[in-house]
Amino acid sequence: MKVQIYQLPIIFGDSSKNETQITQWFEKNMNAEVDVVVLPEMWNNGYDLEHLNEKADNNLGQSFSFIKHLAEKYKVDIVAGSVSNIRNYQIFNTAFSVNKSGQLINEYDKVHLVPMLREHEFLTAGENVAEPFQLSDGTYVTQLICYDLRFPELLRYPARSGAKIAFYVAQWPMSRLQHWHSLLKARAIENNMFVIGTNSTGFDGNTEYAGHSIVINPNGDLVGELNESADILTVDLNLNEVEQQRENIPVFKSIKLDLYK
């Protein structure tokens, strides 16, 4: 499976310019060999939290329409990061994915809101776990958002249910880059799966985003990584490595869920 990761500099509070930027990246970088494209967290408006009442998408309407067009045009599955999204008068940080036929194949609201950013004052936390879902080739994957990375429990269910890839979409700060590396590697090792961390780059006020989008294999080895600059990372994944690692180190056969209460 060939995966292409878009490490974008999100334009603060301007969904139109962000859509234009993404469109240009597709036009410049897409080719028929790519199976999956991945976008970062909150790519429509960034963390313009105080103005999301006016700027957030309405029930994924605009964001889904935009991504659906790209998926159908380029015949590619898109793990579409996440967007600020109003539903039932509440604002969510909503991750979603669209297959190459233009079908919505996943929707997930960020469960863990970041207290350090006062997200709870502006956003509503999701109430459902991240589910496994199928890409066009039948591969089961899952999609989580940024701060979710610090909660290993959230990935256990989709991993145990057969997901072979975990996509963490993020706006992760440079000040915690060491945590980004360590936590992504840990999630890959403990679940015997590929983990893909897709981050943004650039500045949002005084916050510098770390970039360093990264792919880690089920053994915890580095497959590919970007630096802090805006760029694209393309990797080829051998998904047989997941089954091999789960046979060699059968953690899900050894797990004792009844004891972990």
UniProtKB/Swiss-Prot annotation:
**Enzyme category, top tier:** hydrolase
Q: EC number(s) per UniProt?
A: 3.5.1.3
Task: For this UniProt record, give its keywords in alphabetical order, as a comma-separated list.
Answer: Hydrolase
Which residues are named in the active-site annotation? 41, 110, 146
Q: Which reaction does it catalyse?
A: a monoamide of a dicarboxylate + H2O = a dicarboxylate + NH4(+)
Spell out the InterPro entries in the cross-references: C-N_Hydrolase (IPR003010), C-N_Hydrolase_sf (IPR036526), UPF0012_CS (IPR001110)
One family name in Pfam for this protein: CN_hydrolase
Q: Which molecular function terms from Gene Ontology are attached? A: omega-amidase activity
* Source superkingdom: Bacteria
**Which residue numbers delimit the CN hydrolase domain?**
1-239
Q: Has keyword Cell inner membrane?
A: no
Q: Please give the function described in this protein's UniProt entry.
A: Hydrolyzes alpha-ketoglutaramate (a-KGM) to alpha-ketoglutarate (alpha-KG) and ammonia (specific activity 3.87 umol/min/mg), has weak activity on L-glutamine, almost no activity on deaminated glutathione (dGSH) and none on glutathione. May function as a metabolite repair enzyme.
What family does the entry list?
Belongs to the carbon-nitrogen hydrolase superfamily. NIT1/NIT2 family.
Query: What name does this protein carry?
Result: Omega-amidase YafV
